[in-house]
Swiss-Prot record:
This is Putative antitoxin VapB12. The gene is vapB12. The keyword Flavoprotein does not apply. Keywords: Toxin-antitoxin system. Belongs to the UPF0330 family. InterPro entries: Put_antitoxin (IPR003847). Possibly the antitoxin component of a type II toxin-antitoxin (TA) system. Its cognate toxin is VapC12 (Potential). Pfam families: VAPB_antitox.
């Protein structure tokens, strides 16, 4: 078990919605709802790229990451 601190206004909001449930149950439900909403937002984008487009995009992202890493390493080496 852990102790957490929350603002008074957040506590009052949780108190309003908790009913007979524990704060842990309410927080867990809110987290699950949030994750569910996030999954649904992400799922709507599945399948919008064909295989070739997806590979091309992945390659571009990898190249951008490599350039960014190189740029950061170069800048850090100047210190």
């Amino acid at each position: 078990m852990k102790t957490i601190m929350i603002r008074d206004d957040v506590y009052k909001k949780l108190l309003e919605i908790k009913g007979d449930k524990s704060f842990s149950e309410i927080i867990e439900e809110l987290i699950e709802e949030s994750l569910s909403v996030r999954r649904k937002k992400i799922e709507k984008y599945f399948g919008i790229l064909n295989e070739e487009e997806a590979r091309g995009l992945a390659k571009e992202i990898e190249e951008m990451r490599k350039r960014t890493d190189e740029d950061i390493a170069r800048k850090l080496s100047n210190y």
